[in-house]
Regions:
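N-terminal glycine/threonine-rich, aromatic-flanked beta-hairpin/loop signature
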Residues: 65-116, 155
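A structural detector for short beta-strand units
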Residues: 75-77, 94-96, 119-121, 138-142, ...
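Residue-level recognition of conserved beta-strand positions in structured domain cores
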Residues: 89-91, 134-136, 143-145, 154, ...
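Acidic, glycine-rich flexible loop segments
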Residues: 117-141, 146
Length: 175
């Protein structure tokens, strides 16, 4: 008797998973479930592998160390990637985007500061760096790896160094 040939696992593409958005008022203190868990599509060429749960270990503003009692030291972010899609979940927001250089497929969500102000952000990968450019605002937000650390350059000359504390499907650490 012949054994049935096992079926290869189904490929789940980034397109197969609905785009996520920040819930009204943000997600609060409890991280939502990961968005791209089921996705099996490989990362696009040129995408740095930023996947994981990340926690701040140091921060500077205009080159000056930020005091360790500041809120940024409690900052945790989850980065998920699949194909050309990237999702950052942190600070009460879910920024789900295609990293394809278009405003149409970039972030369409709200600011972390008030959870209501709409934003549209173009996302690209440039020389191993994830670059975000808000439409109509002359700034860049970047994330890149330096060894095993994630370097996040944010608005106002803020640079945050984060350490991976888990995978993208792991629960966030206690803060």
């Amino acid at each position: 008797m012949t054994q049935p040939t096992p079926k290869p696992p189904a490929v789940v593409l980034a397109d197969d998973i609905p785009i996520a958005h920040t819930p009204p008022g943000g997600f609060g203190d409890t991280f939502p479930q990961p968005i791209l868990t089921r996705c099996t599509e490989p990362l696009v060429a040129g995408a740095p592998d930023l996947r994981g749960m990340w926690r701040t270990v140091s921060a500077t503003k205009a080159g000056v160390p930020v005091p360790s009692d500041q809120k940024i030291y409690r900052h945790v972010q989850r980065i998920e990637q699949c194909g050309n899609r990237l999702v950052v979940t942190a600070g009460g927001v879910i920024h789900d985007m295609r990293v394809d250089g278009t405003a149409e497929h970039g972030v369409h969500d709200v600011l972390e500061s008030d959870y209501t102000t709409p934003i549209n952000v173009v996302a690209t990968y440039e020389n191993g760096v994830h670059v975000l450019r808000p439409v109509g605002v002359p700034i860049e937000i970047t994330r890149h790896l330096e060894g095993d650390k994630l370097i996040w350059k944010y608005v106002g000359d803020m640079q945050v160094t984060l350490q991976r504390v888990g995978g993208p499907n792991d629960p966030p650490p206690a803060t």
